[in-house]
């Protein structure tokens, strides 16, 4: 994982304190990290966005791809700050034009994510950052990264607000993309 422009411990604690924990949601035994309390906390949200802007301003990015749905919040905000394009990675069936799709395994079954074939305006050799709110087992992120690579663009890094480190999703994803996680949970 990259170590360039890592957030300091005090700032990490501010972000952690702004994320609400809800036990047994969406089902018993799950500990859910609710980012809505970070999003509606102007100080915490802007601290995070300032950090991401500082980290990525020198990466020469052309696009930021955000994973549905919570990745959209951070990806679109950062794309706006960096004055570059935002590309949504959607669940299957949510995009209206011609798409490519990637299947991935869930705990009980499979799911799929997709991108428009022209998501990057048919440009080649562009630099793309992938963003989502959390990486757990890495299935969704791995599928999203594979989709981006299939369109012959440069996946510069995959960024997550939170990493559930015990489940090794970031480690798995690091096989195909550099990974940066703001917070380790």
UniProtKB/Swiss-Prot annotation:
GO terms for cellular component: cytoplasm. PROSITE patterns: PUR_PYR_PR_TRANSFER. Its EC number is 2.4.2.7. It is found in: Cytoplasm. InterPro entries: Ade_phspho_trans, PRibTrfase_dom, PRTase-like, UPRTase/APRTase. It catalyses: AMP + diphosphate = 5-phospho-alpha-D-ribose 1-diphosphate + adenine. One of its GO terms (biological process) is purine ribonucleoside salvage. One of its GO terms (molecular function) is adenine phosphoribosyltransferase activity. Pathway: Purine metabolism; AMP biosynthesis via salvage pathway; AMP from adenine: step 1/1. Its main location: cytoplasm. The keyword Glycosyltransferase applies. Keywords: Cytoplasm, Glycosyltransferase, Purine salvage, Transferase. Pfam families: Pribosyltran. It is an enzyme of class 2 (transferase). PANTHER family: ADENINE PHOSPHORIBOSYLTRANSFERASE. Belongs to the purine/pyrimidine phosphoribosyltransferase family. HAMAP family: Aden_phosphoribosyltr (MF_00004). Catalyzes a salvage reaction resulting in the formation of AMP, that is energically less costly than de novo synthesis. Homodimer. This is Adenine phosphoribosyltransferase. It comes from Aliarcobacter butzleri (strain RM4018) (Arcobacter butzleri). The lineage of its organism: Bacteria, Pseudomonadati, Campylobacterota, Epsilonproteobacteria, Campylobacterales. The gene is apt.
């Amino acid at each position: 994982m990259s170590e360039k422009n890592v957030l300091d411990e005090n700032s990490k604690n501010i972000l952690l304190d702004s994320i609400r924990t809800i036990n047994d949601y969406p089902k018993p035994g799950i500990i859910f990290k609710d980012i809505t309390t970070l999003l509606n906390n102007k100080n915490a949200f802007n601290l995070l966005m300032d950090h991401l802007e500082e980290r990525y301003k020198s990466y020469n990015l052309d696009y930021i791809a955000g994973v549905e749905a919570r990745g959209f919040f951070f990806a679109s905000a950062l794309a706006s700050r960096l004055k570059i394009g935002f590309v949504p990675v959607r669940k299957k069936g949510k995009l209206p034009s011609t798409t490519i799709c990637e299947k991935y395994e869930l705990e009980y079954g499979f799911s799929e994510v997709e991108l428009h074939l022209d998501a990057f305006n048919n440009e080649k050799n562009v630099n793309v950052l992938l963003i989502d709110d959390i990486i757990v087992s890495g299935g969704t992120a791995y599928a999203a990264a594979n989709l981006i690579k299939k369109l012959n663009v440069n996946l510069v890094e995959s960024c997550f607000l939170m990493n559930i480190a015990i489940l090794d999703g970031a480690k798995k994803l690091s096989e195909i993309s550099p990974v940066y996680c703001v917070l380790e949970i």
